[in-house]
Design a protein with these regions (language model features):
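Terminal peptide-recognition signature
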Residues: 67, 141, 164, 178, ...
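Zn2+-dependent peptidoglycan hydrolase active-site motif and core
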Residues: 160, 175-212, 237-239
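Residue-level recognition of beta-strand microenvironments
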Residues: 144, 183-184, 211, 228-231
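Conserved, short, structured surface segments that act as functional micro-motifs
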Residues: 192-197, 201, 217-265
């Protein structure tokens, strides 16, 4: 989702106050009785537990963002203000070959990015509920979602997931019911599992020491999909847990804890 989105031929919801501010990487919840459908630009989707949920991409440009829904036979809109958010800077030192890529490695990364991009456009019936289940039990403190990474002194793209330090071999668990959309060995992500949960929600589990599922296999919430490792570009054993919802890079903490979701009136 690049740039601000404006919806035409719709009147603002009566009683709307000043637009609430939201941060990139969050999820906005707009609840009311009688919601029939939700929309954002040309995308339409079904309400979840009586509310519309709008994921805000980590790189969503600051500015007004207009949300819409159909409720009791009428179309309603509201506006939120996507603000600038200063995520922390993370400095890492890694082997040179993992930062300054050879022609072959660069071609591999580009191919893997294309393979992942196809997953972000998947659509199907919703198979999950909120909050999601933790991918580790117990779940350690995570961090660094959205951090601006400086690797070997060179600025790199923001971190689009959350890293959880855990012992090598610790079980990694599916966050919700779904289908294994892809299993891969990636240059950056190492051994990785991607699970499609429907409604455009895909969770990813990276740097695994082993993979316990196969592509096309159904998985249940809390089922083991692999084990913590340090494969790919990693400084030590940890789980990189990422979430894409309708293409947007979302902070996993938002979907693991309902208190983190930003509710608007």
């Amino acid at each position: 989702m690049a740039g601000a989105i404006a919806l035409a031929s719709a009147a603002p919801t009566p009683g709307a106050a000043a637009a609430p501010r939201v941060r990139p990487g969050t999820v906005v919840r707009w609840a009311a009785e009688g919601i029939e459908s939700c929309s954002l630009g040309e995308k339409r989707f079904e309400p979840l537990d009586g509310a519309c949920y709008y994921p805000v991409d980590l790189l969503q440009r600051a500015g007004p963002w207009t949300l819409a829904r159909a409720r009791r036979g009428r179309r309603e809109t509201t506006t939120v203000q996507v603000g600038k958010f200063d995520y922390p800077t993370q400095r890492l030192t890694l082997p040179r070959r993992m930062v300054e890529l050879s022609k072959e490695d660069l071609e591999r990364v580009e191919r893997e990015n294309r393979e992942m991009a196809r997953l972000w456009t998947r659509a199907g019936p919703r198979r999950f509920s909120l909050p999601l289940a933790a991918p580790l039990d117990p779940l350690p403190k995570g961090g660094r979602f959205g951090s601006r990474r400086i690797i070997n002194g060179q600025p790199r793209s923001p971190h689009g997931g959350t890293d959880y330090s855990a012992p090598e071999g610790a079980p990694v668990l599916a966050a919700a019911d779904g289908t294994v959309a892809m299993v891969a060995n990636q240059f950056f992500g190492g051994n990785a599992v991607f699970v499609d949960h429907g409604d455009g929600l895909v969770t990813m589990y990276m740097h695994l020491s082993r993979v316990d599922v196969h592509e096309g296999e159904p998985v249940r919430r809390g089922e083991r999909v692999g084990a913590v490792g340090s494969t790919g570009r990693a400084t030590g054993p940890h789980l990189h847990f990422g979430v894409r919802w309708r293409g947007a890079r979302v902070d996993p903490a938002v979907l693991l804890d309902p208190q983190e979701i930003q509710a608007i009136g």
